[in-house]
Amino acid sequence: GRFKLLELSLEAACFAKAAPLLEVGCATGEGSAHLAELGYTCVTGVDIDAEAIAQAREKFPGVSFVCADARHLPFAAGSFEGIISEAAFSVIDGKAEAAREYARVLAPGGLALLHDFAAAAESAHTQPGIPCLDGVQSMAGYRAVFEAAGFERVCESEEYGEYIGIAMSLGKAYGVPPT
């Protein structure tokens, strides 16, 4: 399903069910709610879009949602054992600032799990007509951002199954033919 890659990453991360987890770019809260459904009891979703946060709060009253900018998270240093971001980091303006904030709010030994689109090469990447693909970087570009923010170990893998379906749906929704 939609959250299969997230579930696999959570399994590998071995977070305790009571670990404080932050989903950055939660939109209307489905990912954060899914974490709660999996038994994680201390989940906070954050998004810059106040309307999306209002919808998330209405749909999932048992989960905490905060309207905030990923570059200026309103949490104390070391507040979270894990940060999750599902197809959201690529659309953040100021990725370096956001990555530094991720590092700041993570507890020592904490993990950031990002699932996002990546470009094949180093250059500015946009897909005319599909806003959520603006700002996509290569894997090397993302790695450089997180290493510069102080992350000690940056692991990456390429998974296509779930994202091919998403990309096809986006293309169809925005009237952009596959190339």
Predicted features and spans:
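Conserved alpha-helix/loop element of class I SAM-dependent methyltransferases that forms part
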Residues: G1-K17
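A short acidic, Gly/Pro-enriched loop at the edge of an enzyme's catalytic core
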Residues: R71-G82
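A short SAM/SAH-binding and catalytic strip from SAM-dependent methyltransferases
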Residues: G82-G94
